[in-house]
């Protein structure tokens, strides 16, 4: 059974992937709290896993749009579920995308790229 991992404003489901929430994801997600971004920032999360860092970015930067790329099917499924269930669903995008094979038109200016 997939028991959610609860954070401040959202719950994270991770039952379809082998990559579980770890300290590194929580630290990476907390790091931008010491930084500022422009209004309506555009953030890219490469290798998003279950979406925890993307969700933390959306929580921290209330008007940012976060694009997440993930290639592993289970993680992609979990991230899709987590994004849809979050209060930030309208600002989160998940794509089955590989960084190495991204097409030029998929690259537009990002204010922050995390991985």
Question: Model regions: which residues?
Answer:
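Conserved SAM/SAH cofactor-binding pocket of Class I
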Residues: 30-115
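Class I SAM-dependent transferase core
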Residues: 1-36
């Amino acid at each position: 059974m997939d028991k959610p991992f609860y954070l401040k404003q959202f719950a994270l489901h991770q039952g379809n992937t082998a990559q579980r929430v770890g300290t590194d994801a929580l630290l990476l997600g907390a790091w931008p709290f010491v930084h500022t971004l422009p209004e309506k920032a555009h953030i890219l999360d490469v290798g998003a896993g279950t979406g925890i860092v993307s969700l933390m970015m959306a929580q921290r930067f209330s008007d940012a749009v976060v694009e997440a790329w993930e290639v592993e099917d289970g993680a992609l499924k979990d991230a899709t579920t987590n994004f849809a269930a979050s209060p930030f669903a309208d600002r989160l995008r998940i794509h089955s995308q590989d960084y190495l094979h991204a097409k030029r038109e998929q690259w537009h200016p990002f204010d922050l790229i995390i991985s």
